[in-house]
């Protein structure tokens, strides 16, 4: 029984982390595996919290009129296609191999966080049409594959690409990130669900905590200064 309140508490922390930048799955996946779930079930269960985080973040940004469609829709759909492929790979892979890959990913993501370039500040000249849109759709297909496979640390990758390539400011980066993650996570979650790889008790406990943490952050997110240092 104690697993459930612990997961709610973990979810609160992860909700804030995911909405600010990402990387919450680096915490939740190992915890779910530690609690005894097979790696593929932990991966599928983790998607419930991700869905609730992305959904509540989207509602927060929408309530403040921060929208980045149709760009976020276009890249989100390409990410969705990629996520279906990535999720199926995660389902088919052996648990021991997945855990080794996850360990390597955790090290890489930590290094990215420590040594990533600083987010660009101020009013930027966005590049979200024409050739930039085509490149973005291709990149988000790859990002979606990774997100469908494991999702850990993907928020940092998305933030860096949207800011450094698409030249979005921090608030629009976070709004776009939340929309894209919501779109592709629906596909990944359904893939795990169809294969009966979701523990709803753990997932909902984590999800409700995540929802609270996410709302805690997004209530003030649109009023914060347009800068962040991912290092």
PLM regions: where:
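Lipid-exposed faces of alpha-helical membrane segments in multi-pass integral membrane proteins
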Residues: 9, 13, 52, 81, ...
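Membrane-interface alpha-helices at helix entry/exit sites of multi-pass transporters
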Residues: 39-45, 70-71, 168-177
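Selective hydrophobic functional segments
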Residues: 44, 48-97, 185-220
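Alpha-helical transmembrane segments of integral membrane proteins
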Residues: 5, 44, 97-104, 134, ...
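Selected transmembrane alpha-helices and immediately adjacent juxtamembrane segments
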Residues: 1-38, 125-174, 204
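Loop-to-transmembrane alpha-helix entry segments
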Residues: 92-106, 118-124, 197, 201, ...
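Transmembrane helix exit motif
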Residues: 56-66, 104-128
């Amino acid at each position: 029984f104690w697993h459930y309140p612990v997961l709610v508490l973990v979810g609160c922390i992860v909700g804030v982390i995911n909405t600010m930048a990402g990387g919450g799955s680096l915490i939740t996946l190992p915890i779910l595996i530690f609690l005894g779930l097979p790696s593929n079930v932990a991966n599928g269960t983790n998607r419930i919290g991700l869905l609730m985080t992305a959904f509540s973040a989207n509602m927060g940004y929408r309530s403040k009129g921060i929208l980045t469609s149709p760009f976020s829709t276009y890249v989100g759909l390409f990410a969705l296609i990629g996520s279906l492929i990535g999720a199926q790979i995660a389902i088919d892979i052996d648990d021991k191999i997945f855990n080794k890959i996850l360990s390597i990913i955790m090290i890489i993501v930590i290094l990215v966080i420590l040594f990533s370039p600083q987010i660009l500040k101020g009013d930027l000249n966005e590049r979200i049409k024409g050739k930039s849109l085509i490149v973005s759709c291709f990149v988000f297909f790859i990002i979606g594959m990774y997100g469908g496979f494991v999702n850990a640390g993907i928020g940092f990758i998305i933030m860096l690409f949207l800011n450094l390539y698409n030249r979005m400011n921090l608030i629009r980066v976070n709004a776009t990130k939340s929309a894209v993650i919501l779109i592709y996570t629906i596909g990944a979650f359904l893939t795990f669900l169809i294969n009966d790889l979701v523990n709803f008790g753990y997932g909902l406990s984590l999800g409700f905590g995540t929802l609270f943490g996410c709302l805690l952050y997004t209530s003030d997110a649109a009023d914060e200064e347009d800068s962040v240092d991912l290092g």
